[in-house]
């Protein structure tokens, strides 16, 4: 199944190259903007301004990423898209994207403070262990959040349900999620080579949405076969049969 996923991601990216490039250019310029915003904020002595600039940065980038979610879902479902769909989608994602950006920024800020305190200032073994636990919790959270935008785009759930399902998908498909995380890191590395014009956020969203769409076949299959009761039986999914119509 993973081999087919890689092939589909490449074909979908190539067939929608113009939209991928346009979205990535918008995201790239926004990225430059938030970098300058944070540089300006760091030049001040006001901690509140620094935190505010940091939070606004994640909210803005989240809005631009979420806006491409519906287009990525259409691409994953073999539907055509229009360039203007991306910009038209922005008003509809403002609430969820802002909450997501706020959530991520709060997690990062709390983690930064915790690591600074427990690893550098706390001299006890308990403090070190607590700091390590926080790091691992963050790893689980961010691995789960890989699925947030694809879940929202494919299932059209509200923020709370998307968050809940993100963790369910992660813990039920931990190995697959780790593979997708590594794949995302590879895409990010390749994006740097292409100066962010190709692959980048649009390519990653297409890849993750394709991954979730194919993975959901597993749950359709298990629902149709309630006799597969044990964990061992539920692991044997006939992927070649399930993705046959997509080939």
Cite the ranges covered by each PLM segment:
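Helix-coil boundary and N-terminal low-complexity module in membrane systems
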Residues: 1-120, 127, 144-147, 151-247
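Alpha-helical transmembrane segments of multi-pass membrane proteins
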Residues: 129-141
